[in-house]
Amino acid sequence: MSTHLEHDDKKDAAHDYTQQVTPADAVPSSDVEDVEVKSGLKRNLKSRHMAMISLGGVIGTGLFLGTGSALANGGPLGLFLGYATMGSICYCVMICLGEMISFLPIPGGHIKLAERFVDPALAFTMGWNYWYNWVIILPAELSAAAVLINLWNDTINNALWISICLVVVVAINFLGFFGECEFWFASIKILTIVGLIILGIVITAGGGPDHRSIGFQYWRNPGPFVQYDGISGVLGRFLGYWAVLTQAAFSYIGTEIVAIAAGEAKNPRRNLPRAIKRVYIRILIFYLGGTFIIGLLVPSNDEGLALNSGNALASPFVIAIRRAGIPVLPSIINACLLTSAWSAASSDLYTSSRALYGLSITRQAPKIFSRTTRRGLPWISISFCALFAALSYMSLQSTAGEVFGYFSNLTAAAGLMTWWGICFIYIRFEKGLRTQGIARSSLPYSSRLNYRASAAWYGIIMITIILFFSAWSVFLKDNWSTSTFVTNYLPLWLFPILWISYKYIKKTHFVRASEMDFVSGLEAIEAECHDEAPPSTILGKFWALLM
């Protein structure tokens, strides 16, 4: 990703901004603005924590396991193009979010931004949609962790493994260790994917025990694309690519978690732009590099890709390793996948509790959820969200597990609706800046690629198309599935229904561009910001480069 596409203004953003707009020029927001900047949350998350929180939220089973079925559906080139297309959308969402949240790093993240720059009704809709998304993924990740353990021991009831994982996840969040634990969890995941990419290159070049050079062999036979569902010609290849695109969309969901953590970030005006700018670049490198190597290592017609084991045996990396005759690595990779699921569950509880906290401080959830401990932990929100982890035990019973699966599947579309909302908020945000004569270059972070909200419009258009055609496969001959149709399209209709219903009941109005408040709360945010001395040692400089 070229560095000329974005720049990080090194000047003090608040100084530049106040030269253009004074408090007298701005229309103050609602009286809850004081809650934003005087919230009970504490800014305890360092730069390295912020970088790893966003990375940890997206690098996981989608890359390690989900790419297997994507390869089977689209072929090696279809796999790469699908993830590249979705990566471009992820990039646009992140630069939109980065400009806004770096300027206003407030508790509630994009939920509060929706209230401030669009409409309280959108904040209500996005907040509850986001809370549901992560509070339901939480038990799904706990169930996945138990299945991963089954690779080593399938004689013990999964309820025990779920309980152990749940206790650890709740303890991490209640004791305030989330940032530090997520840093180490995410580090393991990054080392794993980097190691797998390097190993994949070695195997492809013939460096495995069998010394067989693969090269682009599988791009020639069975070919770069898969004819989806046996449909011949260009249409079959395009449908294979589109199947990958919808799967890739769900793998990238989670990059926006950094916005929810912004209200707890130390020195946010400095650390958030750095974290956001570096995170999406690394995600694209890991995903695009990983999918390209996978397309070289495993043929798209390999029978192992059809496995539904839920553990490392279904990973295309493991399939390639076993093909190369390396016996020990599958268990090691499974251990890394287990830490990935554990990390994701911890992140899910953190994100859902902060989303609920954000709803509470905007008076769109009971006030009790905004209570915090002296250490700044929203303990009631954490406790309430942790209760939903008990849904993971539903997966132990076939009927209940099927019902739970339906709820889990709803989260994929809900995540894309969040991205759609972020892009829409940015369009209004950018409109407000232009109307009030505020230069985007005065913001702590801005991207030249997002001129006149072009990146936001690209994101909205692409996400809308993906959402409308997410369940297209059910319309193929003899392929109808009511559950697939409902779980893909229900969130698409619930989102506007919630928005319109809240707007009608509460009589809310769109915030006019000329009345948007770009001032309230800045003084407290500026007080949290300070210059940091650059590292002087070689090790320190290397660490700063990584983070």
Language model regions located:
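Membrane-interface "cap" regions at the ends of multi-pass membrane proteins
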Residues: M1-G68, A72-L77, C90-Y91, I95, ...
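Helix-loop-helix junctions that connect adjacent transmembrane segments
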Residues: G40, I156, S187-V328
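Extracellular loop-to-transmembrane helix junctions
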Residues: K42, M52, L63-L160
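Membrane-helix boundary/coupling elements in multi-pass transport proteins
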Residues: I106, N129-S143, Q247, Y252-A265, ...
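Helix-loop-helix connectors at the membrane interface of multi-pass transporters/channels
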Residues: I111-R116, L142-I162, A259-R269, R274-I281, ...
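TM-loop-TM module centered on a large, flexible mid-protein loop between adjacent transmembrane helices
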Residues: K112-A114, D119, F225-I231, V244, ...
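Membrane-interface loop-to-helix entry segments
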Residues: L160-R220, I253, I276-Y280, S408-G421, ...
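C-terminal membrane-solvent junction of multi-pass transporters and transport-like membrane proteins
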Residues: W184-F185, I214, R371-L377, W419-N488, ...
